[in-house]
Amino acid sequence: MIQRRRFLARGAGFGLAATLSPAAIRHAVAAMPLVVGQSAALTGPQAGFGTAMRDGVQAALHSVNRHGGVNGRPVQLLSLDDQGDKAKTAANVSLLVANPRVAALTGFTTRPCSEAGAVMAAEEGIALVGAFSGTPLLYGDKAATTFTTRASYERELEAIVQHYRLLGLSRFGFVHLEDARSTNVPLLEKILARNGGQLTITAPVDRKGSGLNAAALRTLETNPPEVLIILANNAPLTGFLREYAPRTLVMPKMVISFVDREKLLADLGHDAAGVGFSVVVPEYTREKYWVVREFVALARELGTPVTPVSLEGFITGLALAEGLKNARSESRTAIIEGMGKVGSLDLGYTNMRFSRNERTGSRFVDLSLASRNAGLV
């Protein structure tokens, strides 16, 4: 098991040309950063996710570089903006993999973009470490070179369903992104079937804005569920909850982690009361965990906003760095193998595990609830 002190101190070496003198090797290594590529939504309606993931990964690499980098070599993040658009992600990945200096990929965002990136990464034989999505494809064979650093949506949905089934509730509703219906509705139906619940109503919303909100609200009024699960981003969700949450204070409403929670709470204010959230990293107030403590300190130093998404990016960056340190060389194949050699990384709140046969690093899920002052309990 790799713990904090050992993690920060490690610096596995890459093989270098034997024809170079030690001094020349040191100079060459110091002069050339190891580059990892990112495609994420850095502008547009989903920019909150992309910038937070980028900033979290950057904070992790800052820490790694401060402690000697990888064999004395700094690690550099090259981020490209895809605006949350699948076609732009594909174009960005093509640019990144065409650059021989890009050794691995990291920090992708949204389901369509993460899926596109994962499939292309597998085809190109390059590691993709961490994506801000729990969509099933990332955990399957089509994403054979993707190493996930968050629990899947299946794990999050199951945690919510099991919690409310224990409380005796069985009738569930689902607000989902319209373009993800074919993936996420059957997934929830499967989870409910094995836990003795029923999906009684579904309502789609638009990933890019509030255009479908009125129809979703009307649909839910026809057959109110006992529990409402929501898997949507901020663009539709803020307006939806501003109208729906005050009407349904008693009804549990649980939002899956694919959301900029802090912005949502700030935008909703008192209207957030009673809205619950599933999270795939610990609350950033829990500084008893070394990884949280270290991130919060670095974030203050770097001026990085502290959110669950930026903390997830930080954890992703640490996992990536550990894979780089385990690689026998800087080749893309060696880095994939290096990720498979990470073993158990002790983050305090959970052990992230990667092996040759295990690419799902974390299964951690927790639940929280917004109070009347938009805080969390």
Regions found by a protein language model. Give the residues of each.
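Extracellular/periplasmic Venus flytrap/periplasmic-binding protein
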Residues: 91, 136-137, 144-248, 283-293
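Beta-alpha junction/loop-to-helix N-cap segments that form part of ligand/metal-binding clefts
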Residues: 49-53, 70-140, 205-210, 236-238, ...
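Segments of small-molecule ligand-sensing domains
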Residues: 300-310, 318-376
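Extracellular/periplasmic periplasmic-binding protein-like sensory domains
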Residues: 243-313
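Periplasmic-binding protein-like
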Residues: 101-109, 129-131, 173-176, 224-234, ...
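N-terminal export signals
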Residues: 6-28
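Extracytoplasmic "Venus flytrap"
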Residues: 37-56, 80-86, 109, 179-182, ...
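C-terminal segment of N-terminal export signals and the immediately downstream linker at the start
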Residues: 1, 23-41, 48-50
